[in-house]
UniProtKB/Swiss-Prot annotation:
Residues 93-268 form the Helicase ATP-binding domain. PROSITE patterns: HELICASE_ATP_BIND_1, HELICASE_CTER, Q_MOTIF. It comes from Saccharomyces cerevisiae (strain ATCC 204508 / S288c). It comes from the Eukaryota. The modification Phosphoserine is found at S13, S37. This is ATP-dependent RNA helicase SUB2. Gene3D superfamilies: P-loop containing nucleotide triphosphate hydrolases. Keywords: Acetylation, ATP-binding, Helicase, Hydrolase, mRNA processing, mRNA splicing, mRNA transport, Nucleotide-binding, Nucleus, Phosphoprotein, RNA-binding, Spliceosome, Transport. Changing D174G: In SUB2-100; no growth at 37 degrees Celsius. The lineage of its organism: Eukaryota, Fungi, Dikarya, Ascomycota, Saccharomycotina. SMART domains: DEXDc (SM00487), HELICc (SM00490). The keyword Electron transport does not apply. It catalyses: ATP + H2O = ADP + phosphate + H(+).
Amino acid sequence: MSHEGEEDLLEYSDNEQEIQIDASKAAEAGETGAATSATEGDNNNNTAAGDKKGSYVGIHSTGFKDFLLKPELSRAIIDCGFEHPSEVQQHTIPQSIHGTDVLCQAKSGLGKTAVFVLSTLQQLDPVPGEVAVVVICNARELAYQIRNEYLRFSKYMPDVKTAVFYGGTPISKDAELLKNKDTAPHIVVATPGRLKALVREKYIDLSHVKNFVIDECDKVLEELDMRRDVQEIFRATPRDKQVMMFSATLSQEIRPICRRFLQNPLEIFVDDEAKLTLHGLQQYYIKLEEREKNRKLAQLLDDLEFNQVIIFVKSTTRANELTKLLNASNFPAITVHGHMKQEERIARYKAFKDFEKRICVSTDVFGRGIDIERINLAINYDLTNEADQYLHRVGRAGRFGTKGLAISFVSSKEDEEVLAKIQERFDVKIAEFPEEGIDPSTYLNN
């Protein structure tokens, strides 16, 4: 249970239970489980963490039924066709459902979202007009997606209300929803800026919060302004509550900052940061001149087999221009970036998720946490500047342990340096894309 989120808080690094999960086992789990955010993976009772400090887990589960969840949750899980928890879920849920603080770092696609969704719903005893669960994330689309996960798993819990709040929309609408006891949510998913504004204006009462979750916590807490927003929100909640933090990447520098919000946390890390690359994802690069990118992209879209593709560029201007070019070249595409109006962003995100378009051009607004199951091709039209961001980008393809393909354009000396850093950081060999192409069976699921 956690207390304050102040800068000068003690770090509880001497007390946490730390579980190091073998990355290869986690990947195998992801491959054998159902293709969804709640169920990657088969169980492995012989955890690699057995000899590590505080690595005991009270319950070893072979299926979701062994978590002894509420019947309503179990029904929803069965409806989704889920049977076996992923390695991360297996090690985390038995303690998180009992209120243990959690700091979890595991690669994209291993079902971290389901950990806090199921854990908080399991503990929730809804009281009309009282917010019991707060989930904070850095992106509006991610907030929308998390809200949908709550709706999916609470389908047999009709008394549970969930709402999502983010900037770019009239705060008066949020205030109206919160004021009415018939519509006031028990679960709030929000971006930090909007939730801070609701707290400051006293539109929302967080004095009954029992669970406080930060998704993509490294991104939320590494930016000072966002961290201050989170601290202000944190101080508006009770001292006695559960705090859970999740991310695909957690640097050594950000972990002490996370721990300031936690007390006696269970810590879940993959055993080796170098193994964070995605199992089942084929990764290649293509060396070319900047002026050759458009022609090569068109060739790839013609030659490759894919369900949906996401193309990453470095600016909103380039996103708009490339989308125009693709549409003019008979490649129906949609673009999503941070400079468009919020309603438009959400509408386009939904359109892409609903398979109305197969091609999406985006900036890094789609680079973290967004789960669209049909994406099996990611193209870095402009290579990112950071190795960790590369992981988040290409993680949009090959989600949940399924196969996928990632191709990066390398057009400058800077790109070559970044590519070298990526390979060193993740201990992976990214090969040059063969001139003759590749066998679709290597990146397409049966």
